[in-house]
Amino acid sequence: MVLLSDVVRTSAEVSATRSRKSKVAAIAGLLSRLGEAEVGPGTAFLAGELRGGRAGVGWATLSALDPAAAGEPSLTVAEVDAAIDALREIGGAGSGQRRAELLADLLARATAAEQEFLVRLLGGELRQGALEGVMLEAIAAAAGVRPDAVRRAFMLSGRLPATAEAALRGGEEELGGFRLEVGRPLRPMLASPAETLDEAMTELGEVSVEYKMDGARIQVHRDGDDVHIYTRTLREITRHVPELVELVRGLDCRSIVLDGETLALDDSGRPRPFQETMGRFGAQSPRDLLLHPYFFDCLHLDGRDLLDLPLRDRLTALEEVAADHRIPAVLTADAEHASGIFDDALEAGHEGVMVKSLDSAYAAGRRGRTWRKVKPSHTLDLVVLAAEWGHGRRSGYLSNLHLGARDPDGGPPIMVGKTFKGLTDELLAWQTEEFQRRETHRDDWTVHLVPELVVEIELDGVQTSTRYPGGVALRFARVLRYRPDKDAASADTIDAVREVRGPQRAAEGG
């Protein structure tokens, strides 16, 4: 029976080292000690997650509690997991008070170090998508299986606890039992940025060059008349998008899984602001604003899984059933032809193009170099770490953003700069309210946040700097928009920031 203190100690060891090898060894050592019923919750806690999602406890409740700490550790992983499940099940009149009482009882049994860990775990402050890669390597080491087998199972399940349970219980045989399941979302394949269109074309040869639309990523699953639609973070939005459900039901197939984008268009066919598209996914979504789907991949068709087939074959399947809803694209090895569609995409109001090798398999959940994205300016998706109170016209608003890049070795986000450029009055008002809901602590001028909000930043380039721990700083950064469709695990890494060069037209060589 493993104690929570063992998880806390291991988590501290992982946070204290920059060595990926040491992180993997520490986590694998603890995973190998967990009993069968402890593997799921133990894996989740180590990753800074809760198995069933949020427990319905906010920072206001957590910060109001201050019970005396226990002198010696006694809480087990199983007891904490059961208490969190109980918190989640509380509802009805007086639920807030009952949650506070249950939480106070739990914290009273915890040592000071365990209390700090539990508060950060329940508040979402420990969630680090960057730790996923380290966790997967540790699961493989603890179970004595190939890392590729663990990664593939995770791609298909989308859940670290389930992947760890399968690996430690049944090894590669049980991991091999994970399949693409229609109705269960899988993690989307991601693209790496290319500096220029010529660079991408030279690397990949014959490619599909597609519009990179200014929309939201969707994954569509259909089995008969049963349709489910998910965002890039695997959140189900089916009930919010009835027009997409109706369209997918009309496709000439029995079962299908499609990857694509959706967006709202104005009367001239140009994309409406991204926030309007994302507004359709909320509880108060404006149903009179119709969404249009544009699909670019087919992962399953009528009982056949297509993930491991080359893109050219998946596009053939897509053409069979959804030709009228394909994203604008050309298949070519000619740079001049590709440059034409790049210009067309920009003229139509979109972000740029995607360049994809026709030989590429679908690497779910991974950011590979067989898919490249090309834009006319540098942009990065970064995590908001904190914000400073403004001065003058911005007085009373949280304004200057502290921006962090993802640590590929599983550490906390690495600060790379600050900016208040590009913030409209509307955004200032929104983030001042939103940031205080996500606050972890504050000092005289700065409010620090749970590192989970992603913001898209445009910049001229980066420069070497000793001011920030990553050794680089953003140049002339400005806010383009917040990305509610992305989580911190989708943010750009510090390596991606370092690779950014100075301004140049993305379609040009050199």
From Swiss-Prot:
Q: Which PROSITE patterns match?
A: DNA_LIGASE_A1, DNA_LIGASE_A3
Q: Which Gene3D superfamilies does this chain map to? A: DNA ligase, ATP-dependent, N-terminal domain, DNA ligase/mRNA capping enzyme, Nucleic acid-binding proteins
Q: Which GO terms describe its biological process?
A: cell division; DNA biosynthetic process; DNA recombination; DNA repair; DNA replication
Quick check: keyword Lyase in the entry?
Answer: no
Q: What is the main EC category here?
A: ligase
- Cofactor(s) this protein cannot do without: Mg(2+)
CDD domains assigned to the protein according to its UniProt record, in alphabetical order: Adenylation_DNA_ligase_Arch_LigB
One GO molecular function term?
DNA binding
Q: Name one Pfam family in it.
A: DNA_ligase_A_N
Question: What domain of life does the native source organism fall in?
Answer: Bacteria
Q: Which keywords accompany this UniProt record? A: ATP-binding, Cell cycle, Cell division, DNA damage, DNA recombination, DNA repair, DNA replication, Ligase, Magnesium, Metal-binding, Nucleotide-binding
The keyword Metal-binding is assigned to this record: yes
Catalytic center residues: K212
InterPro entries listed in its UniProt record = ATP-dep_DNA_ligase, DNA_ligae_ATP-dep_bac/arc, DNA_ligase_ATP-dep, DNA_ligase_ATP-dep_C, DNA_ligase_ATP-dep_cent, DNA_ligase_ATP-dep_CS, DNA_ligase_ATP-dep_N, DNA_ligase_N_sf
Q: Where does ATP bind?
A: E210, R217, R232, E261, F296, R367, K373
Q: What is its EC number?
A: 6.5.1.1
Reactions catalysed, semicolon-separated, are: ATP + (deoxyribonucleotide)n-3'-hydroxyl + 5'-phospho-(deoxyribonucleotide)m = (deoxyribonucleotide)n+m + AMP + diphosphate
UniProt function note = DNA ligase that seals nicks in double-stranded DNA during DNA replication, DNA recombination and DNA repair.
Member of which family? Belongs to the ATP-dependent DNA ligase family.
Q: Which HAMAP family match?
A: DNA_ligase (MF_00407)
Q: What is this protein called?
A: Probable DNA ligase
Biological classification of the source: Bacteria, Bacillati, Actinomycetota, Actinomycetes, Pseudonocardiales
The coding gene here is lig
